[in-house]
Swiss-Prot record:
This is Cytochrome c oxidase subunit 2. It comes from Vulpes macrotis (Kit fox). The gene is MT-CO2. Cu cation A1 binds at residues 161, 196, 200, 207. It is an enzyme of class 7 (translocase). It comes from the Eukaryota.
Length: 227
């Protein structure tokens, strides 16, 4: 869950988000080292009286500043590709949920059940109860079992939307006429909030997403009551 004046990313709830946090730290360290080196060189140039105005050729330096950036790019690309393949891999999902974006709400259909579907609208500010979050609460939460692989099929009925839940490391575009898919697995129970992350019209800011991750026994009870 995000909080005011937060500087870092949200706490990881899924294995994918944990990998993304590690990759963020890895890349940030490389950027910090490069920035420190550049700042050191600039400071050295401004403070030293040594100049090389007569230097016409420096093949050793050219070789270093060609090979070193290539190595740095490889160090960034390899873990990035690994995470991309992890995000694209879908193996035997335990549950499939179809998500459709609309202007301006989400609809959900549990395809493994015969008649389990609902729309999810944002709760207006004037109807919020004490402790509920402004612009993030919905009338129907998406209840899912924790510690199980869930496949999300995502599309749109009208314009471009984007289904995103930061703490799970999820962001998938909802495109009219196209069905995108992603997987999620939460390692602990709780409420996880997201929002539409593609500008989709005047009420784009009023399309929250709320996932309620629960133990399997609770999910089975909930699904039986909903059907």
């Amino acid at each position: 869950m995000a909080y005011p004046f937060q500087l870092g990313l949200q706490d990881a709830t899924s294995p994918i988000m944990e990998e993304l946090l590690h990759f963020h730290d890895h890349t940030l360290m490389i950027v910090f080292l490069i920035s420190s080196l550049v700042l050191y060189i600039i400071t050295l140039m401004l403070t030293t009286k040594l100049t090389h105005t007569s230097t016409m050729d420096a093949q050793e330096v050219e070789t270093v500043w060609t090979i070193l950036p290539a190595i740095i790019l490889i160090l960034i690309a390899l873990p990035s590709l690994r995470i991309l393949y992890m995000m694209d891999e879908i193996n035997n999902p335990s549950l499939t949920v179809k998500t459709m974006g609309h202007q301006w709400y989400w609809s959900y259909e549990y395809t493994d059940y015969e008649d389990l579907n609902f729309d999810s609208y944002m709760i207006p500010t004037q109807e919020l109860k004490p402790g509920e979050l402004r612009l993030l609460e919905v009338d129907n939460r998406v209840v899912l079992p924790m510690e199980m692989t869930v496949r999300m099929l995502i599309s749109s009925e009208d314009v471009l939307h984007s289904w995103a839940v930061p703490s799970l490391g999820l962001k998938t575009d909802a495109i009219p006429g196209r069905l995108n898919q992603t997987t999620l697995m939460a390692m602990r129970p709780g409420l996880y909030y997201g929002q539409c992350s593609e500008i989709c019209g005047s009420n784009h800011s009023f399309m929250p997403i709320v996932l309620e991750m629960v133990p399997l026994s609770y999910f089975e009870t909930w699904s039986a009551l909903m059907v």
